[in-house]
């Protein structure tokens, strides 16, 4: 329920569900009745979104249908056989000014996750669109990517 029905609209829901489960295992019933009630109310009142579920199911369908891409050369460890010595250098997103970077590793213009207008997903929509715009404008030229 917390992942499939609520998802990113209220990312705390998965923690609430996990905490409730752990408490039920630790203290048992009937003592954990209130814990379960609190978790159930949280889930019932949380905004709902299945965008995360739809995204992973779409990605899995792509894989099943053979529409996959090889691992980008810059992601293959320099210690592995088969890495070309002239492969593009890995550009760590941790070192990018925004902590995310513009490197698009998929290599194709394909989108799986589309946030809804529900809950916290509504707040994620614009930053995600901004990131996608920056990645499109950066293109595949390693010189235009964030270091």
Where are the regions a protein language model picked out?
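Terminal-proximal interaction/regulatory segments of ATP-powered molecular machines
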Residues: 1-98, 107-108, 112-147
């Amino acid at each position: 329920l917390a992942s499939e029905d609520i998802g990113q609209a209220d990312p705390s829901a998965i923690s609430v569900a996990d905490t409730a489960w752990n408490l039920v295992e630790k203290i048992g019933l009937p003592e954990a009745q209130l814990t379960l009630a609190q978790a159930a109310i949280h889930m019932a009142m949380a905004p709902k979104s299945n965008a995360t579920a739809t995204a992973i199911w779409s990605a899995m369908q792509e894989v099943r249908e053979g529409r996959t891409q090889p691992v980008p050369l810059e992601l293959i460890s320099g210690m592995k056989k088969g890495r070309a010595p002239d492969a593009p250098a890995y550009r760590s997103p941790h070192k990018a000014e925004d902590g995310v970077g513009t490197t698009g590793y998929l290599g194709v213009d394909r989108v799986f996750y589309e946030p809804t207008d529900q809950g916290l997903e509504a707040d994620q929509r614009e930053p995600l669109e901004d990131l996608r715009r920056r990645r499109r404008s950066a293109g595949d030229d390693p010189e235009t990517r964030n270091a």
